[in-house]
Amino acid sequence: MGISYSVDVDSEASAKAMLRERSISLKHSKAIAREISGETVADAKEYLQAVIDEERSVPFKQHNSGVGHRNDIDGWDAGRYPEKASKDFLKLLSNVSNNADQQGFDADEMVIEHVAPHKVGESQGRKPRAMGRATTWNATLCDVEIVVTETEEVTA
């Protein structure tokens, strides 16, 4: 049984990749996915590297209570620099670029058509407490899928 994606795409004009069971925040992943969707692969890589370097922030349009305001976001105020999730998204973009190159496409010019994070479970953990007790301390696991397609040239 193969890996299933949440969208059906034409394999002749697209490439896809997936991160499996990564210990990253689902909320951060959703915010990053919303921001890079529709961008070219090269632009998305540049953006994520700027997020890691804390030069540009990711707008948090959901789950944003208590999130500080950033002045580099146009049309929005709340944002953060989710470094851990951004590094995993860079790995995902590198993977989909390699898949696109293998299929004969120019990877950096392809457009991100679909990117979706999904919660797939929790990694069980325990945190020791006083008197020999322990509290569960679980980590969320996420899958992230991405599909890139060729840009269609518009002739005027």
UniProtKB/Swiss-Prot annotation:
The keyword DNA repair does not apply. It holds the Pfam family Ribosomal_L22. Coiled coil: none annotated. Keywords: Ribonucleoprotein, Ribosomal protein, RNA-binding, rRNA-binding. PROSITE patterns: RIBOSOMAL_L22. InterPro entries: Ribosomal_uL22, Ribosomal_uL22_CS, Ribosomal_uL22_euk/arc, Ribosomal_uL22_sf. GO terms for cellular component: cytosolic large ribosomal subunit. GO terms for molecular function: rRNA binding; structural constituent of ribosome. GO terms for biological process: cytoplasmic translation. The keyword Translocase does not apply. Gene3D superfamilies: Ribosomal protein L22/L17 (3.90.470.10). It comes from the Archaea. Part of the 50S ribosomal subunit. This protein binds specifically to 23S rRNA. It makes multiple contacts with different domains of the 23S rRNA in the assembled 50S subunit and ribosome. Belongs to the universal ribosomal protein uL22 family. This is Large ribosomal subunit protein uL22.
